[in-house]
């Protein structure tokens, strides 16, 4: 049986402030792992998750979306700040040392590995798990959303989970 999603992390946000899963108070967390140089999957998923958050209406105030970098060598806080600014939804970019990012990946059971690619910026890409994780306040795992789900389906499931998990 696979290990459960732990949801723990200790990283820095896109302003350089240390954060962990408890830093967002009574808000649910919508967590997506990716990297700023991703050309297709990450921009598409961030747009979809942003649309899902907009579809929540007033409930969106109870959710903090997080974009966790799997490429800490390139994704500094400043790079992530610029990256999340291009995507609606109020995402906070998170990064850290290689060890911190590896610990967060392990906690969420995320696969990501640097692969050489001469055509890519910096000479490599980082294929990674493309799931969004929905966590209760404090970091308890509630659900994950596959890449194949559209924004209305994600919004409906988040609404259902928040109504059953009142603060």
Model segments located where?
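Hydrophobic beta-strand anchors of alpha/beta hydrolase catalytic cores
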Residues: 30-31, 65, 132
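Short, hydrophobic alpha-helical segments
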Residues: 158-166
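Thiol/disulfide oxidoreductase modules built on the thioredoxin-like
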Residues: 100-157
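Structural microenvironment flanking redox-active thiols in thiol-disulfide oxidoreductases
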Residues: 44-104
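Short active-site neighborhood of thiol/selenol oxidoreductases, capturing the structured segment around
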Residues: 21-45, 49
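N-terminal "domain-start" segment that seeds a small globular fold
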Residues: 1-22, 47
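Short loop/turn microsegments at loop-to-beta-strand junctions
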Residues: 6-7, 29, 129-130
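Short acidic-hydrophobic, aromatic-tinged amphipathic segments that line or gate anion-handling sites
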Residues: 12, 92-96, 113
């Amino acid at each position: 049986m696979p290990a459960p999603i732990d949801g723990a992390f200790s990283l820095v946000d896109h302003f350089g402030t240390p954060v962990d899963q408890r830093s967002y108070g009574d808000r649910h967390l919508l967590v997506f792992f990716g990297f700023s140089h991703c050309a297709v999957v990450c921009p598409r998923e961030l747009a979809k998750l942003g649309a899902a958050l907009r579809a929540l209406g007033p409930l969106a105030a109870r959710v903090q979306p997080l974009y966790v970098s799997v490429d800490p060598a390139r994704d500094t806080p400043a790079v992530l700040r610029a990256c999340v600014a291009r995507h609606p939804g109020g995402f906070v970019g998170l990064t850290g040392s290689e060890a911190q990012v590896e610990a967060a990946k392990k906690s969420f059971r995320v696969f990501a590995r640097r692969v050489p690619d001469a055509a890519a910026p910096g000479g490599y890409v980082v294929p990674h798990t493309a799931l969004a994780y929905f966590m209760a306040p404090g970091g308890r795992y509630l659900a994950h959303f596959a890449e194949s789900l559209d924004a209305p389906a994600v919004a409906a499931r988040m609404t259902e989970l928040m109504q059953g998990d009142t603060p």
